[in-house]
Every structure is written in structure tokens, then in C-alpha cells.
Amino acid sequence: MNYTISIGITIGVLAGILVSLAESLNVLSWVCIVSWALYYASGAGVEGLKKTIASNVTGVIYGFIIVWGAGILGFPYALGVMVAIFAFLMCAQAHISIFSFIPGAFCSAAAYFGAGAKPEVFIAVATSLILGTVLGFVSDILAKSIMKKEKPTVSNKSSNSSS
């Protein structure tokens, strides 16, 4: 079995479990799935796990600060000013290796906005982002494990055909 099939199986099973349990876990399944995809986009593996979680956490914090700061400033276009400042910061933080996955920060801020951009959704969004990344990591490990457990097949063709 190749990796594409084994990852399809593991993601399918884990995503089905996630969606079934999301409400009782107080997580947003769509945010988990976005973060899950970000894990693979970051290059996967342990480094991808670290970079995705770090960038996701900063992104959701930045999203919260953008909305909060715009409310404090209270002038027309305050939201645009806050977005400009924090979009710059999301890119600038990439100079630090652990925060170098820029799409993670942007998608996580967008997830906060998409979930309603209210203080009461912050924990659910942050938890969902972390859970989605961990599910990406687990699905990757399980897919590779399935590939290793597959028994090699013996070809019917003999390598010595001169007999």
C-alpha cells in the first residue's frame, strides 16, 4: 500500500471520529481540519508539528489582539490599521525558526475571525488549532505504520530466466 492510500485511510477514520466528537469536546471541527492541513503544508514531521503549533498559537493571539485593539482605538479604519500592523508581525516573526510557517499564523487569525472574533471563542479556536495539528501528526505516523506492516509480495517472475 502506498502512502497516499494509507494516509487517506488514517485521515478518513480520524476525521470521522473528530467530527463525531467535536461538539462534546468543545472544539470546532472545521478549525481542526484547517490546522490539520496546515500541518502537512508545513512539511509534516516533528518540525512541522512544532512550527505549525507555534505559528497557529501566535496567529490566534494576533487575531484576538487585532479585534480587541481596534475596539480600544475606536476610530474609523482602526480595524484596518490593526490588521496592517499584525499582518506585518505575522511575516516578521518568521525570522525566528519556530515561527517561520507564515501561513499558520494567517490561517489561525482567520479561523478566529471566522469563528466569530469574540473573546468567548478564543479558547475553542486555540484548542481546535492545536488538536488539528496533533491529529495531522498522528495521521502521518499511523499512515507510515500501516505501510511498514504490509508484507512484501513475491513476484512470480524469476530473476534467473535462463533455466
Question: For each predicted feature, which ranges?
Answer:
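Short, amphipathic, aromatic/basic-enriched membrane-interface segments that mark the entry/exit
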Residues: M1-T4, A22-L25, V46-A54, G71-P76, ...
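Pore- and pathway-forming membrane helices of multi-pass small-molecule/ion transporters and channels
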Residues: N26-G43, A84-P119
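Alpha-helical transmembrane segments and their membrane-interface boundaries
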Residues: M1-A44, A117-V125, L135-E150, N160-S163
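Hydrophobic faces of alpha-helical transmembrane segments in multi-pass integral membrane proteins
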Residues: S6-L18, K50, A54-I66, V81-M90, ...
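Structural signature of hydrophobic alpha-helical transmembrane segments
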Residues: L18-C32, V67-A84
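Canonical alpha-helical transmembrane segments
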Residues: A37-T52, F64-W68
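Interhelical loops and loop-helix junctions of multi-pass membrane transporters/channels
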Residues: M1-T4, G8, I85, F106-G114, ...
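Hydrophobic alpha-helical transmembrane segments in multi-pass integral membrane proteins
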Residues: F64-L73, A115-V125
